C-alpha cells in the first residue's frame, strides 16, 4: 500500500480512468497553489507529531518511572489503569471523550470548569478550531499508553538495585542523577522499543 501510494503520488488518478504519469506536478501544486496545506495542515501535523510522538514517549517514561516507585500491588493496579485505554476499542474511546468534551453545560469538563469558576460559559471543545487540536492530542496521549509504557515499566522494575547502591557510593545525590546515570542507561533496550511503539 505504501509503494502504491508513492507511485500514485506521481500520477493523475481519479479512480475512474487509469493513472496518468504527471511527474512532480502534484507536489508542485501542493506546495505552490494549496494555501490551506501550508497554512494549516503542515503546522498542525508537526504539532500533533511532536506532542503525541515525543510527548507520549516522555510521558510513558515518566509514568513508568513513577509507578516503579510504588509497592508491587499498587503498581500492578495503576499499570492496568494506565494500560487499559490501549485495549479499549476506538468507538468506546470516542464515546467516552465525547461525553467529557461535550460543548453544553452538561459536558463533564465544562461542568467542572464552570463549577470551579474557571469559565463562565461552556466551551465547544469539539467544534472550536482553537480547541480541537489540543483535544485530539490529549485523547491520543491517553490512548497511546500501551506496549511501550509496559516495556519501559518492566525495564525499570528489573534494574539491578545494586547499581543504585553503587551509584550512591560513587556520588549520586538525588533521584534526577539516578535517572540520568543509572535508570536510563539500564533500560536503553526497553526505551528503544518504547520509542518505536510511540
Question: Where do the protein language model's features map onto the residues?
Answer:
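A structural signal for multi-pass alpha-helical bundles of membrane permease subunits
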Residues: 1-198
Amino acid at each position: 500500500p505504501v509503494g502504491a501510494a508513492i507511485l500514485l503520488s506521481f500520477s493523475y488518478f481519479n479512480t475512474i480512468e487509469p493513472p496518468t504519469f504527471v511527474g512532480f506536478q502534484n507536489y508542485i501544486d501542493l506546495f505552490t497553489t494549496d494555501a490551506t496545506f501550508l497554512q494549516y495542515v503542515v503546522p498542525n501535523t508537526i504539532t500533533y507529531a511532536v506532542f503525541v510522538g515525543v510527548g507520549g514517549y516522555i510521558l510513558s517514561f515518566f509514568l513508568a518511572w513513577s509507578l516503579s516507585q510504588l509497592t508491587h500491588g499498587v503498581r500492578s493496579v495503576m499499570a492496568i489503569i494506565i494500560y487499559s485505554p490501549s485495549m479499549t476499542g476506538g468507538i468506546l474511546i470516542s464515546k467516552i471523550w465525547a461525553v467529557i468534551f461535550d460543548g453544553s453545560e452538561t459536558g463533564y469538563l465544562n461542568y467542572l470548569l464552570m463549577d470551579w469558576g474557571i469559565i463562565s460559559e461552556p466551551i465547544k471543545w469539539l467544534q472550536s478550531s482553537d480547541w480541537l487540536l489540543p483535544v485530539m492530542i490529549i485523547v491520543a496521549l491517553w490512548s497511546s499508553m500501551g506496549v511501550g509504557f509496559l516495556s519501559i515499566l518492566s525495564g525499570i522494575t528489573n534494574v539491578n538495585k545494586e547499581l543504585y547502591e553503587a551509584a550512591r557510593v560513587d556520588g549520586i545525590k538525588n533521584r534526577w542523577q539516578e535517572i540520568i546515570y543509572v535508570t536510563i542507561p539500564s533500560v536503553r533496550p526497553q526505551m528503544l522499543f518504547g520509542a518505536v511503539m510511540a
